[in-house]
Amino acid sequence: MVENAIALVAHPTSAEIIVNHVKDGLELAKRNRLPTRVRAFIPEHHGTMRVSFLYQKAVESTSNGKVDEAAFRYPGPKPQSKETALLMLADGCEAAVRASRPATPEEVNEIIRKVIADRISWGQLDECPLTMADLEKVRQSFGATLQGMFHPRLIYPDQRDGAIERQRE
């Protein structure tokens, strides 16, 4: 079983599918008459980020390392509100923690710090009113939440065999 069907598609095609889901989402939101403020979340939470994983794979798969970066970039706009910026950060942090499978709270916190720092360095938060104090609160909140969601679980002996013991009434 393939965990991610997009992995079966060529890199530029995969990027097109991923980037176009924003346009498709906006059309769906408009068709369903979602308020403009709600619709803003669809493009803004991706900003003008690059679909980095697929971009890197495409660069590695070419003989000269040249790839049209624009084909791997969301059209934007960058987050314009605290709320859309928070969604961008939450989406990025959750995905990074899920993909990395950290073993310790420190590793979770480091992933969160890196995602936030990356969004800042890439200018994704330049057009929203989040302050550094806000970002520190976000980092702490995400740390507590994601540590609770993705902490390593003990494997109990009866689970190793795939059997789940049912309690009898």
Predicted ranges, named:
Residues 10-13, 90, 100-103, 107-169:
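Long, compositionally biased intrinsically disordered regions
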Residues 1-105, 109-114, 118-122:
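Divalent metal-dependent catalytic cores for phosphoryl transfer on phosphate-bearing substrates
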